Amino acid sequence: MIDTTLPLTDIHRHLDGNIRPQTILELGRQYNISLPAQSLETLIPHVQVIANEPDLVSFLTKLDWGVKVLASLDACRRVAFENIEDAARHGLHYVELRFSPGYMAMAHQLPVAGVVEAVIDGVREGCRTFGVQAKLIGIMSRTFGEAACQQELEAFLAHRDQITALDLAGDELGFPGSLFLSHFNRARDAGWHITVHAGEAAGPESIWQAIRELGAERIGHGVKAIEDRALMDFLAEQQIGIESCLTSNIQTSTVAELAAHPLKTFLEHGIRASINTDDPGVQGVDIIHEYTVAAPAAGLSREQIRQAQINGLEMAFLSAEEKRALREKVAAK
């Protein structure tokens, strides 16, 4: 189902949601951190989704073990490097990794700015080693409030040339986008792109707000757009992309089953929507699974899957020249 003549991308992928269970085990031992299990086999049910979670917040608790073992900046550097290694192993040509340095720093009170620097270093070294092209998206974790998001923003701005875009993630219902207008004004002043998690836990009004008030060029998940025909028309007309994450939306109980997922309808409506993983380490999936198992189960035809693959590159936060070069590089292989 993957067209090997086209670039394969993953533009909604959380770096801090893709920490290998084996790495959690090893870092736990290295830093004497108490884990819920002492073997890989018994640890996996604690750090990966085995059955669908009742809601998004329950799903997010699975991520916590991954960041609890980040006891040093070297550990942060390691997981960033391994994210690129994983991307290469799964055949990705281009990946946008998003991360919340405040979340990664929290368990061991690491310096937030230091986490940003460590992630940049690890990703840079991974790209050199494995030949994958990557860009970084800074996440503000709204769940921790405006002040914590401000701290994350300042850390990103200290490395503004290595950050491509700003995102807002976390508790969408408890912390609406309206609380973060000034943060996104500064992001646009820095020349960054904007993508926002919206329409996952909250309704279509959250997506409208992300676009109109925060300046979103892309929407993370965006499943609730299906409830608003005018919004779907607007997304198609303005070419505002939806970063679809099929398996994730089932595991968080955002969508009941793959057959009911709105991605097929979005594509039929002319919306620029792509296929992505979200938190592959926690979900126990990879991009190949999303294309070859999840997308057909969601009712997508072979041509629709190919269109979603094309959309992934078109939506990417790359210049027209960078996109052309990537297309030519893949076609030449």
From Swiss-Prot:
Gene3D superfamilies: Metal-dependent hydrolases (3.20.20.140). Keywords: Hydrolase, Metal-binding, Nucleotide metabolism, Zinc. GO terms for biological process: adenosine catabolic process; DNA damage response; hypoxanthine biosynthetic process; hypoxanthine salvage; inosine biosynthetic process; purine nucleotide interconversion; purine nucleotide salvage; purine ribonucleoside monophosphate biosynthetic process. It catalyses: adenosine + H2O + H(+) = inosine + NH4(+); 2'-deoxyadenosine + H2O + H(+) = 2'-deoxyinosine + NH4(+). This is Adenosine deaminase. Its EC number is 3.5.4.4. Catalyzes the hydrolytic deamination of adenosine and 2-deoxyadenosine. It comes from the Bacteria.
